[in-house]
């Protein structure tokens, strides 16, 4: 399915978006009904867990999902969203179609029904979401070895860095100090996948104090 944009301006805020996602995940036909269980927004993408039940109370039979104990199945849907000339639009995809965007929170994944095929697109998508969630959020002063060298502008590379920050106005922004040069670089979360913590700042002396003492030796 392609993009669908709303030209009536009814979706303008986060609350509007969430309400529309809930509406899109709610449906009742002659045999089945679908309802939203949970929705989370990561960046501009909405991730939704939707539960399907049979109206007559019999267990839902599905080729992709294992039926839950209550007779329902719960699947994930991904909604790409953006604004174009002030109009909100979305493009949706069910997890079994293998969406590219794969940053659904673990709390949402925990609500989903088990999959019958371990080699399915949905299984691979869930694994990518889990891999993303496993990327650590490093603390100020943590020394890190990246899984592979990162190529910087100019052709140089870096692999061992220390988490720090810089300020833009009143905002603190995460960056990393390069071990070899002392220069600062911003790294995407994806580039931290598979990284190794070499030393932790927790319980250590202040980085500022440590630098001061090192200069006196």
Q: Where do the PLM segments sit?
A:
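Acidic interaction surfaces
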Residues: 2-3, 9, 39, 43, ...
């Amino acid at each position: 399915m392609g993009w669908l944009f709303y030209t009536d301006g009814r979706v303008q805020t986060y609350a509007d978006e969430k309400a529309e996602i809930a509406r899109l995940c709610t449906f009742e036909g002659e045999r089945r009904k679908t309802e939203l269980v949970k929705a989370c927004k990561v960046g501009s993408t909405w991730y939704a867990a939707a539960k399907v039940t049979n109206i007559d109370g019999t267990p839902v039979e599905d080729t992709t999902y294992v039926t839950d104990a209550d007779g329902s199945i719960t699947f994930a849907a991904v909604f790409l969203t953006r604004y174009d000339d002030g109009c909100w639009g979305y493009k949706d995809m069910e997890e079994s179609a293998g969406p590219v965007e794969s940053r659904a929170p673990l709390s949402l994944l925990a609500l989903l029904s088990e999959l019958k095929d371990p080699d399915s697109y949905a299984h691979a998508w869930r694994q990518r979401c889990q891999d993303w969630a496993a990327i650590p959020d490093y603390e100020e002063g943590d020394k890190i070895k990246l899984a592979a060298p990162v190529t910087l502008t100019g052709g140089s590379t870096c692999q061992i860095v220390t988490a720090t920050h810089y300020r833009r106005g009143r905002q603190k922004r995460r960056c990393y100090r390069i071990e070899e040069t002392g220069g600062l670089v911003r790294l995407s979360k994806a580039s931290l996948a598979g990284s190794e913590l070499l030393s932790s700042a927790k319980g250590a002396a202040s980085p500022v104090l440590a630098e001061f003492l090192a200069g006196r030796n």
